[in-house]
Swiss-Prot record:
PANTHER family assigned: CYSTEINE--TRNA LIGASE, CYTOPLASMIC, CYSTEINYL-TRNA SYNTHETASE
EC id: 6.1.1.16
Name of the protein in question: Cysteine--tRNA ligase
UniProt cross-references to InterPro entries, sorted A to Z: Cys-tRNA-ligase, Cys-tRNA-synt_Ia_DALR, Cys-tRNA/MSH_ligase, CysS_C, Rossmann-like_a/b/a_fold, tRNA-synt_1_cat_dom, tRNAsynth_Ia_anticodon-bd
Gene behind this protein: cysS
Listed GO biological process terms: cysteinyl-tRNA aminoacylation
Motif 'HIGH' region, residue range(s) on this chain: 29-39
Binding site for ATP: 267
Subcellular locations according to the entry: Cytoplasm
Names of required cofactors: Zn(2+)
Keywords assigned by UniProt, alphabetized: Aminoacyl-tRNA synthetase, ATP-binding, Cytoplasm, Ligase, Metal-binding, Nucleotide-binding, Protein biosynthesis, Zinc
Record motif 'KMSKS' region, residues: 264-268
GO molecular function, one term: cysteine-tRNA ligase activity
Primary residence: cytoplasm
Amino acid sequence: MKVYNTLTNKKEEFLTLVPGEVKMYVCGPTVYNFFHIGNARTFVVFDTIRRYLEYRGYKVKFIQNFTDIDDKMIKRANEEGSTVKELGDRFIKEYYKDADDLNIERATKNPRATEFMEEIIKFVSDLIEKGYAYEIDGDVYFSTKKFNSYGKLSGQNLEELQLGARINIDERKKDPMDFAIWKSQKPGEPAWESPWGMGRPGWHIECSCMAYNLLGETIDIHAGGSDLSFPHHENEIAQSEARTGKQFAKYWLHSAFVNVNNQKMSKSLNNFFTAREILEKYDADVLRMFMLSGHYRTQINFSMELLDSTKAALDRLYNSINNLENLLDEVKNEELRDEELEYKNELQKYKEKYIEKMDDDFNTADAISVIFDLIRDVNTNVTIESSKELVKYTLDLIRELGNPLGILQESTKASLEEEIEKLIEERQKARKEKNWALADKIRDNLKERGIVLEDTPQGVRWKQI
């Protein structure tokens, strides 16, 4: 298996610190709002990578944090008249709802920065003691010049950065590029006791501390959105390696941006979408498949038209699954026949091709193409004459390959029944309101899909024809 390591800017053989085990840390959300589709792509991508590593037999310890103390959180809490803790509690709950709806597996642990205050203070103290940090008026700064390899992740040149940083310079700092790892309390802000007075941690130190305490001095994978590469991840490396003297993470993985209608997503352009807004209109499978239809290191363009195209493609896959589920009930031959054994073995080539694509830096776009090729083959060769064993095998294989991507796991029968019952309720409501046109439209639309409604004294019944 090969992964693209941002640290070296090349694909490398994936060799974990402990064979068969992966220690993985992903930067999670700052919990002051609902997460948007750009965040959603990051969460879906690294959920998929985690799932695939598990599919390949690795035991993955997956940590994704919540930043629950931060300038944005303080500002939002003040605006709405709540405490930072109340705000964090609320949006952590909302995060879980949206992540569950998006079929994102729960992390091994989701630590909150505020749970690690004692450990963060110890981390800062160690950096001061080792000469990598200094205190001024209750603020503590990390000295970037003391860390010789600063800039190695992002490829930034420290001298050039220093020139650029001389705008709005804090004269108290020894160097313009030094960054805060502990901030003294300002009026109205939450704060914790420390050797430097009341204050709170800087953002970068929070992740370094949580990764260190939950995964150890060196981890296998550190991941996040490409916008975090500098300064956040660069600063994490500096702090962590200055403290331990050891490599912080072997592999750095970064997912690319989502543009909206070929423009950068922003509230000012009125093209800002939360994941929740999209999930109200589209199933999780649609959004996941869309997010994975491009390589994770490549920017993707988001539009409702592209989502509709993804939905149409996914519907074709589910129609094939539905046909196979129906075949499973209808076929009469139970056991695999000799001539089917060869075909069953031939289908293994799709699994091998899928693994080949995913082993090449998690190429989900090509892996999805392999699933389409498999289904085209099955549509032609698995029929009413096939054995139950072969039909079941093909269904299981499709679901097996869909599982690491987090798609194609629903039973089409169960989802179809749920959808039809919902439409029947809407029709009943329309009839009660004497909206005959809408009631007839729902009935006719269902008929076009092969669903016939029967109005009986016991209620509405339906059947497929």
